[in-house]
Amino acid sequence: IFYDAPSCRDNKQNQDEEGIDCGGTSCTYLCSVGVQKPSTRFVRPFAPAAGRTDVIAYIDNPNMNAAAKGGRFTIELYGTDGTVLARKQGTVDLPPASTVPVYVPNFVSGYIEVARAFVSYDEPTFKWFRYTDNRIVPTYNNDAEVTGTTAPRITASLTNPSAKALRDVLVIATVFDSAGNAIAATQTVAPTIPAQGTATVVFIWNEPFSTPPARVDVVPIIPLPSP
């Protein structure tokens, strides 16, 4: 007689699980009925140069103690007649109680008029797990400086609070006007942020902003560990 001990990978609801291989104190992953779905704070297409469209989206995780790693999403761009002009898929890590920017450069090429954008989520790929956020995340010092008008340039700094250098940190910048609307976005990589030190990041555009900038979000992206 062979006995298979209950586990969180046996496709059965056992132990103290609240569903099949989820929930309870035994399993890493939470049941979908116990968590809130991701939502889109906003998604906005831009034309930073003639014949090119970029997209910035802010994705919210409303769950205070749950994270998801590598959840899949789809962004669609629609024309003025309601037809889909372009579609792209991507993945995102959502720390607990977070808003994560997703920037997609050169989403579509060509001289087309984009009326709106939409984000949808492949909900089964958002496998939620309990997580206390202990990642080392550099701090944006809220010191963005905008210079230039025909080819704007933004300089900002990030501080590393840890005793270990951080390397190849993706950083996304989003520019907002006085009404709170996103008017531009781009990204760069900070090669090194020294231990307990500061590094400067620079963001460059080749065309003027559509309206005067009033605020800049600078967000470093640190991947979640695997559960």
Model-predicted segments: where are they?
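Proline/serine/threonine-rich low-complexity linkers at boundaries of modular beta-sandwich domains
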Residues: 3, 28-37, 126-135
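Short beta-strand segments of immunoglobulin-like
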Residues: 42-47, 141-146, 191
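Surface-exposed interaction/gating patches
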Residues: 51-66, 124-185
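Cysteine-rich modules of extracellular adhesion/ECM and protease-associated proteins
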Residues: 1-34
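Extracytoplasmic/periplasmic/luminal assembly and interaction segments
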Residues: 19, 26-81
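Extended intrinsically disordered, low-complexity coil regions enriched in Ser, Thr, Gly, Ala
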Residues: 18, 64-101, 162-200, 211
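Beta-strand secondary-structure signal
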Residues: 54-58, 72-74, 101-103, 118, ...
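Terminal connector regions
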Residues: 93, 99-150, 184-187, 202-227
